[in-house]
């Protein structure tokens, strides 16, 4: 470990760079889809880590925070229900970024509401989130929690018309 301090510093700077890129990309969502969609980002709570790094710490067993993007067509009417698409991003250590803007635009044009979780292990939130990956386990719970959040908190979501789409790690 003594011979590896440069590696640790490099890893920290990579995560810091990812966080900066995420903040820039968050602004770009408004540029890419803001003309047709209301864009929001919420913090949700998922199950505790699958394995605590320090099981005796005060935070051991606490719920894990993650973020989710919400895209709602600007054309929605309050007295109508709309279908929901749950869209987990692909890539084990990736994130929901504007790479997907063309897909979000198409879904919004068809009057779908979209929720897209940046589940545990996603990039752009620092080493803590990145290292919480469960490789197909608890990330699924995070995605399901984002679905439930939409159904429980948005009266315009039709709970009988909920779909999921994705590919690779998100599919």
Residue positions per predicted region:
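Catalytic nucleophile loop
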Residues: 170-171
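N-terminal targeting or regulatory segments adjacent to alpha/beta-hydrolase or S9 domains
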Residues: 1-45
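Cap/lid segment of the alpha/beta-hydrolase catalytic domain
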Residues: 36-67, 71-160, 165-167
């Amino acid at each position: 470990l003594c011979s590896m301090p440069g590696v640790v510093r490099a890893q920290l700077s990579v995560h810091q760079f990812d966080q900066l890129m995420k903040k820039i990309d968050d602004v770009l969502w408004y540029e890419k889809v803001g003309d047709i969609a209301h864009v929001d980002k919420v913090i949700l709570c998922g199950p505790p880590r699958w394995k605590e790094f320090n099981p005796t710490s005060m935070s051991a067993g606490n719920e894990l925070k993650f973020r989710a993007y919400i895209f709602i067509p600007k054309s929605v009417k309050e007295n109508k229900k709309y279908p929901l698409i749950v869209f987990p991003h692909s890539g084990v250590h990736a994130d929901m970024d504007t790479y997907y803007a063309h897909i979000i635009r198409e879904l919004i044009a068809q009057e779908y509401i979209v929720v897209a979780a940046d589940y545990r292990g996603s990039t752009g939130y620092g080493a803590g989130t990145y290292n919480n990956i469960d490789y197909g386990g608890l990330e699924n719970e995070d995605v399901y929690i984002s679905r439930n959040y939409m159904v429980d908190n948005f009266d315009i979501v039709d709970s009988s018309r909920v779909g999921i789409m994705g590919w690779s790690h998100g599919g």
